[in-house]
Amino acid sequence: MAITDTRPEVATEAEAPALTTSPNTVFGTGDHTTLGRMWIGAALLLGIAGWVLTALVGVHEIGDADVFTADAAFTMFTLGRVGLVLLVVVPLLLGIATLVVPLQVGANTVAFPRAAAMAFWTWLISAGVLVVANTIDGGFGGSRIEANDMMLASLLGLIFALLVATICLLTTAITLRTPGMSLDRVPATTWATLVGGSMWLLTLPVLAANVVLVYIDHRYGGPSEFGLADNQWAQVSWLVGQPQIYAFVIPVLGMLTDVFTTLGGVRQANRGFVLFGIGAFGVLSFGAYAQPFFYPEVADQALWAGMSLLIVLPVLLLVGAWAATLKGARPPAKAAVGAAGVAVLLLLLAVVAGALYVITPLELRQSGAFAAGQFALVVATGLAGGMAGLYYWSPKLRGRFANEGLAKLSVLAVLGGGTLAGLPLLVLGFANRFDGLADASDALNGIAVAGAALMALALLVTIGALLTASGDTPADDAWGTGQTLEWATASPPVPGNFGELAVVRSSEPLLDATETQEA
């Protein structure tokens, strides 16, 4: 077979299997549901470590504590930044998409399942090497040459793995759609995955090129200064700056749309505007060109400032479309809805902060604290949106609804953690203009540390909510208001996902079927 192991037309319905674990089902699997669970589990665990690391760096910044040496603090800072993106947010969203996208498009599995499995294990091994290399003074600017080379090589492994996983998902969405499902009819999460994955395919290879330049010059020497310790981080830091940082949360926009429409029990109003808004957000998040190391004047260019300002518009468009959809609807007070609402709030704060950052008279570009605060808000957006998706699709993920009490507790934790981790640092960023804020720096940093700790707690509680899921096995349409094809298969999905599917005639095929039966 060229793309899948089993053709959709020969897949048959079966009773949902029990979730069992064995070496074969873990290490040898190409099943997209199992791979999705592994991506999600690893990302949540690494997310806890990433936020703890962020909190420790914040403690170091308070007063004259000097808890760590300057080199150790810098290593922790850079590992925290790269880790929260490449080890947490992107893998978490990839995991959810690996589980959901094949179901949404009516495919029997993810495209290139063996490549998808290879991508996960390559990513996991590379993540382990990255962490080990940083702990033995091999981080950016580290003094141990061999360990530093190992860190750079592990970064290349991470990038390669994420690109392969992305290609598998994009191929699934483009080539394995069920009959009648044109691209303008794909569910919002699949559309956002297409947009986000396309941006990752355009930008992550640029990051890989940066790392290759650093690696070659550092290992073999040469006429350039790419490999010098002081220059390494500067060449890749664009990854966690704006507008590029927005690109890593694009799939969240689709997840929020699906949560609001399904749990609201209504069709998405102005669906075309939603698809356009997600696409526009993706285009405006392209940041591979904004590399101050090679182009110091980039912050003075109208293109960079304009993209940072304009990206607010598609976010407002999406918020307006979601509000119009929910007008008159009464979604249940479930954790999935709460997490989606928190993600919307954090996203609005992040893009407004990004717009303020580029306004020259405010003098925020010289503030590391302001940039750190915006970064925290964007990462928290990705995690809150991911939590909304996890709770929404928990019947497909675990075969049970998540523990609602713990899930709601995690929503409160991510709301408090995200705002506390980001807003105090944004306020501290104005210290260049208001001298009084400098005197409050210790207090503001302390609040940000508490926010980072709350984020770690939120992820821990999320794991608990998913693992303690209980109750009877939900119906195929677990919420009773499903609109898209993932709610037409068992919870959890059976091997092959589907039997014979009817031709899709709109973007909400299950809602069409329900309305036809009622008529």
Give residue spans per PLM region.
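Short, contiguous pre-domain boundary segments
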Residues: 9-25, 56
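N-terminal acidic, proline/glycine-rich, low-complexity intrinsically disordered segments
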Residues: 1-10
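Hydrophobic cores of alpha-helical transmembrane segments in multi-pass integral membrane proteins
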Residues: 2, 36-141, 148-174, 188-264, ...
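Short, charged juxtamembrane terminal tails flanking transmembrane helices
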Residues: 517-519
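Glycine-rich "HGGG/HGxG" loop immediately N-terminal to the catalytic nucleophile
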Residues: 364
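Cytosolic juxtamembrane amphipathic/interface segments immediately preceding
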Residues: 19-35, 178
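Non-catalytic macromolecular-recognition regions in eukaryotic signaling proteins
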Residues: 183-186
